[in-house]
Amino acid sequence: MSRGGAAVAKGKKKGVSFTIDCSKPVDDKIMEIASLEKFLQERIKVGGKAGALGDSVTITREKSKITVTADGQFSKRYLKYLTKKYLKKHNVRDWLRVIAANKDRNLYELRYFNIAENEGEEED
């Protein structure tokens, strides 16, 4: 193992991109996509400070999808946590959940809980 190879890998910045698909709740008018975008811009911490995204993190909105792109490291768990926090704040956490929609787990989707299965069990 050479030291030169490690220095090359360290100098190269790896950008990560995550997408939150909110099409179902936005179509049903349960939530507004603009409010989630604003919430993420205010709450994402960079360097220990919330709201100071700078050039390292960008948030873009396209119809019913929000894309968060980071130049350095960015935790997918942190994005899921903030999305859940938004749902709880707007009292829709009881109906919606955040699910990783693909194998790479860079696409999150807001889906409804499957209530039809639970109704049959409660009647017993």
From Swiss-Prot:
GO terms for cellular component: cytosol; cytosolic large ribosomal subunit; cytosolic ribosome; nucleolus; plasmodesma. Gene3D superfamilies: 3.30.1360.210. One of its GO terms (biological process) is translation. It comes from the Eukaryota. The keyword Translocase does not apply. Coiled coil: none annotated. GO terms for molecular function: mRNA binding; structural constituent of ribosome. Keywords: Ribonucleoprotein, Ribosomal protein. Belongs to the eukaryotic ribosomal protein eL22 family. This is Large ribosomal subunit protein eL22z.
